[in-house]
């Protein structure tokens, strides 16, 4: 609030999504969140039969926040989101879930190779970002991928497999990449 000379409120400065409505976009990354991700999937006119969900997590993100502070951590979150967004096609979408986790949605892909290619593109983009930042923060991402048709099994089962895929990727070490398999589940 900016007051006039008499001490009365003259201007109110803020973001439009802070006016009392439930927030849709994340203030740090500018991305839509989990509820919008689910709404997008539920709005599909045809059952989802192809594509993938890519669950992305920044490895050891807590260490960045601890050593450099929350403002720098937020800068990394926004930068990672921006790098990933630049790698997407017009048919792909990205959402910020929680903390250091994102989901990339592709409902058109017909093979796992397309997820692998996107992962490589994102990894290269993030490497270039780290170099451009003079290695101030060195980090990697882990990625778990599930078939988008898993959504048709119900949101709870989809969530479990989605979380499992990222957990498996992270268990492989930094920069892990895992494509869901029922044999491991």
Regions found by a protein language model. Name each.
Residues 66, 105-110, 127, 147-149:
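Residue-level recognition of strand-loop junctions within catalytic nucleotide-signaling folds
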Residues 1-3, 17, 128, 146:
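Output-coupling edge of small sensory domains
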Residues 24-52, 59-85, 95-99, 104, ...:
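Conserved long alpha-helical elements within nucleotide-processing catalytic cores of c-di-GMP signaling
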Residues 1-12:
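Short loop/turn elements at sensory-signaling interfaces that couple input to output
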Residues 94, 121, 125, 136, ...:
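Cyclic nucleotide signaling catalytic output domains
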Residues 5, 19-22, 61, 112, ...:
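Sensory-module boundary signal marking interfaces of small helical input modules
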Residues 13-14, 53:
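Sensory beta-sandwich core in regulatory modules of signaling proteins
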Residues 17-18, 56, 107:
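PAS-associated C-terminal
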């Amino acid at each position: 609030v900016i007051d006039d000379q008499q001490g009365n409120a003259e201007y109110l400065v803020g973001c439009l999504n802070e006016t009392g409505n439930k927030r849709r976009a994340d203030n740090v990354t500018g991305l839509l969140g989990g509820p919008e991700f689910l709404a997008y999937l539920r709005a599909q006119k045809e059952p989802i039969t192809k594509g993938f969900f890519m669950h992305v997590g920044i490895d050891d993100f807590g260490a960045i926040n601890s050593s450099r502070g929350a403002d720098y951590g937020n800068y990394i979150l926004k930068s990672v989101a921006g790098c990933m967004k630049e790698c997407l096609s017009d048919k792909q979408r990205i959402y910020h879930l929680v903390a250091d986790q994102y989901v990339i949605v592709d409902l058109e892909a017909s093979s796992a190779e397309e997820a692998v290619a996107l992962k490589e593109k994102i990894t290269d983009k993030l490497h270039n970002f780290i170099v451009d930042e003079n290695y101030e923060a060195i980090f990697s991402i882990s990625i778990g991928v599930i078939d988008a048709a898993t959504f048709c099994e119900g949101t709870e089962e989809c969530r479990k497999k989605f979380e499992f895929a990222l957990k498996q990727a992270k268990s492989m070490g930094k920069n892990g990449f895992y494509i869901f398999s029922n044999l491991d589940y």
